[in-house]
C-alpha cells in the first residue's frame, strides 16, 4: 500500500512479516472488493461492519465456499503459493476460528480501523528514505477495497505470529529411536542380594563360639552379605550356609527358612488372635442355635401334651352328658307308664247318699 513519503507498497508495510495465510488457498488472499463480489448476498457494506462481524463473515465464507479464489487470477496465485508452501515445507497455520480480537478493537468498524492504519502507518514510513536518495514519485493512495484480507488483518493486529506458526517437534533420528532410554538410577542400599535392591528379611543372629554374627537370608542367588564377627569375617552365600572360617563352633540349630517375611509354619500373632476369636464366635453361635432348638422342641411337646389332656377331658364330659340325658329320658318314660299302666288308680265319680230317701 502506498503512503505519502514512501517509495512503494512493500516499504510501507510494518516491520512484522505478513503471515502466509493466503498460501492455504483461503479467502484471505482476496481483496475486499473480490470478497464482496464473491459473497454477493451480503447487504451490509464491509466498511460499516465492526471487526467481530467481519471475522464472522470470513469464517462463514471459509466454511461455505470451496478453497480457492473466485477469479482466474486469484486461482493462479493460490496454486503458485501452494507450490511454494510445499517446497518450503512451512507448517500450516491454525484454523481461522482461533483468531482473537483485542477488546478495544472488536467494536470498531472497518473504516475506523482503516483510518487509524492510514494515520499511524504514513508517519512511521516517512523516515525510511535517506537524505541522499531522490524523493520518490507520488503514487496513488491505496483504498480499502484494494487491500487483501490477510494484509488488513496483519496490520490491524488480529493475526499473531505465535498463533499461526506452531512449534514443530524435531523428528526422531534413527539412532535415537533404536537406543532404549536409560534405566532410572537405582537407590543404593546397604546390602545387595542378587539383582534386587530390596532389603532382605532379617534372621535372628547366629551364635558363634566367640561372639555373635548378624546374618540375613537373601532371595537372590549369588549375592553376598557381609557378616560382622569379633574375630574373623564370615560371609554368607545367600542360602544360610556359612563360608570362610571354622564352622564347628556354630550352634547345631539349623537356620530357619524365611518365607514371605515370617518363619514357615508360624503365623503372625494378630492373625492367630483373629482366627481364634472367629472360632470361638462360631462355637458360641452353634451352641446358641442348639439351645434354641431344644427350647422350641420342649415347648412343642408341652403344647402337644396339653392338647391331648384336653381331648381326654372333653371325651369324659361328653360321656357324662350322654348318661345324664339317658337317665332323664328314662325317668320321663317311667313316670308316664305309671299314669297309664294297669296298676294306675282309677279315679271315677261315685254317687253319694245325701238324702234320707
UniProtKB/Swiss-Prot annotation:
UniProt keywords (A-Z) are:
Abscisic acid signaling pathway, DNA-binding, Nucleus, Stress response, Transcription, Transcription regulation
Q: What is its main location?
A: nucleus
Region ranges (Disordered): 166-185
Q: Which parts of the sequence are annotated with region: Leucine-zipper?
A: 303-317
Identify the stretch(es) annotated as Basic motif. 277-296
Family annotation (SUPFAM superfamilies): Leucine zipper domain
Expression by tissue, per the entry, reads: Highly expressed in leaves.
- Residues forming coiled coils: none
What causes induction of this gene? Induced by abscisic acid (ABA). Induced by drought, salt and osmotic stresses.
Pfam entry (one): bZIP_1
- Which residues does the UniProt record annotate as the domain bZIP? 275-338
Extract one GO BP annotation from the record.
positive regulation of DNA-templated transcription
- What would be one Gene Ontology cellular-component term for the protein? nucleus
Any GO MF annotation of the entry:
DNA binding
- Family recorded in the similarity comment: Belongs to the bZIP family. ABI5 subfamily.
| Function recorded in the entry | Transcriptional activator that mediates abscisic acid (ABA) signaling. Can regulate the expression of a wide spectrum of stress-related genes in response to abiotic stresses through an ABA-dependent regulation pathway. Confers ABA-dependent drought and salinity tolerance. Binds specifically to the ABA-responsive elements (ABRE) in the promoter of target genes to mediate stress-responsive ABA signaling.
What is this protein identified as?
bZIP transcription factor 23
Organism of this sequence? Oryza sativa subsp. japonica (Rice)
**Taxonomic classification, please?**
Eukaryota, Viridiplantae, Streptophyta, Embryophyta, Tracheophyta
Amino acid at each position: 500500500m502506498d503512503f505519502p513519503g514512501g517509495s512503494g507498497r512493500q516499504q510501507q508495510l510494518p516491520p512484522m512479516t505478513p503471515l502466509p495465510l493466503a498460501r492455504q488457498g483461503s479467502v484471505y488472499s482476496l481483496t475486499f472488493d473480490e470478497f464482496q463480489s464473491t459473497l454477493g448476498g451480503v447487504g451490509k457494506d464491509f466498511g460499516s461492519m465492526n471487526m467481530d462481524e467481519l471475522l464472522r463473515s470470513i469464517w462463514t465464507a471459509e466454511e461455505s465456499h470451496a478453497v480457492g479464489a473466485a477469479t482466474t487470477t486469484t486461482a493462479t496465485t493460490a496454486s503458485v503459493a501452494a507450490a511454494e508452501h510445499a517446497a518450503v515445507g512451512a507448517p500450516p497455520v491454525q484454523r481461522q476460528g482461533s483468531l482473537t480480537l483485542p477488546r478495544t478493537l472488536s467494536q470498531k468498524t472497518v473504516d475506523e480501523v482503516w483510518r487509524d492504519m492510514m494515520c499511524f502507518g504514513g508517519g512511521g514510513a516517512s523516515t525510511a528514505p535517506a537524505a541522499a536518495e531522490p524523493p520518490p514519485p507520488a503514487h496513488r493512495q491505496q483504498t480499502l477495497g484494494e487491500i487483501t484480507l490477510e494484509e488488513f488483518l496483519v496490520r490491524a493486529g488480529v493475526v499473531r505470529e505465535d498463533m499461526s506458526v506452531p512449534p514443530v517437534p524435531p523428528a526422531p533420528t534413527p539412532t535415537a529411536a533404536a537406543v532404549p532410554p536409560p534405566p532410572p538410577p537405582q537407590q543404593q542400599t546397604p546390602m545387595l542380594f542378587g539383582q534386587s535392591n530390596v532389603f532382605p528379611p532379617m534372621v535372628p543372629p547366629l551364635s558363634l563360639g566367640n561372639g555373635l554374627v548378624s546374618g540375613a537370608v537373601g532371595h537372590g542367588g549369588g549375592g553376598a552379605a557381609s557378616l560382622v564377627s569379633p574375630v574373623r569375617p564370615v560371609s554368607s552365600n545367600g542360602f544360610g550356609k556359612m563360608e570362610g572360617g571354622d564352622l564347628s563352633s556354630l550352634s547345631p540349630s539349623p537356620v530357619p527358612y524365611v518365607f514371605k517375611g515370617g518363619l514357615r509354619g508360624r503365623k503372625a500373632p494378630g492373625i492367630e488372635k483373629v482366627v481364634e476369636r472367629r472360632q470361638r464366635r462360631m462355637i458360641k453361635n452353634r451352641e446358641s442355635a442348639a439351645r434354641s432348638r431344644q427350647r422350641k422342641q420342649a415347648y412343642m411337646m408341652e403344647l402337644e401334651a396339653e392338647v391331648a389332656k384336653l381331648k381326654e377331658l372333653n371325651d369324659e364330659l361328653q360321656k357324662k352328658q350322654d348318661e345324664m340325658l339317658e337317665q332323664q329320658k328314662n325317668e320321663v318314660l317311667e313316670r308316664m307308664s305309671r299314669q297309664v299302666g294297669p296298676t294306675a288308680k282309677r279315679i271315677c265319680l261315685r254317687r253319694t247318699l245325701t238324702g234320707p230317701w
